[in-house]
Amino acid sequence: MAIGRLRLKPRGYDFPPYRPPSESSSLLLRVTRGCPWNRCTFCSLYKSIPFERRPLEEIFEDIEAARALYRDETRSVFIGDSNSILIKTEDLVRILTVLHQAFPNIERITSYARAKTICKKPPEDLRRLREAGLTRLHVGLETGDAELLGSIHKGSTPEEMVTAGRKAKEAGFEYSLYVLLGIGGEERWEQHARGTAAVLNRIDPHFIRVRTFIPQPGSGLYDAIKAGTFKKASHETILKEQQMLIENLDVTSTYLSDHLSNYIPVNGKLPEDKHCMLDVLDEALTALHDDETLRERFSRKDSLRNL
């Protein structure tokens, strides 16, 4: 959807700067700006954006601007920025209602969310949001290892991650969890893999989406690598970590490597595709030792920034 052509108001359409790859065809609607937490040591995406809730009038103006161009073709909407479900439930219900009125063919509305926010939302509020048309929540798990969650300043415990996931599923949401390969570095990759699998098994989310940790300038872990206090995981370690993660999964989730940061595509429906997924990783680990071109390709991934 080429909504970049929107130029209907002097102030301009306010686009969310980031969205999941799976929302590449969605209309983007900015409800909040920035990240209300903004302390994770691996992330610098919102460091320069103060958190604020956008006025409802501005949001409704943006919906009207988009409706004028894309009323009938809009099938999905992504709500940004990083945790818009923390606004008042009645306000988000109003926004969802207006979206459905403006775009009669909407099939899906999704949003980023924090586990802590989901934990704090009363179950009846989550059900109201679901009934109003919010269908999927994208949530960063990153890791299920308690020590790592603390060291990266995620702001949630493994138990809170589990509580949030179960609560969201009980309210009827599709639940998409993000795992950050390599976040344990060379020192803690096994604990990361096992702990993450344990949390995922207790939630059984609809989607597990993996990304590979890439140090971002301006983040705490980038500085730690430069200072020599964090040893970045090698290509081989990250492949072995993903292998251990998948081996320990006992879920019915769709597993997706739908991000440019990942070294190789490992995708499938669990549990039926587990053996094929592990075979892909076995082949990559074998090739890594013998194929200079593959090693160079992996190294180019390491130079990516802000993905």
Regions found by a protein language model. Give the residues of each.
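Structural preference for beta-strand elements that scaffold enzyme active sites
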Residues: 28, 76-78, 108-110, 136-138, ...
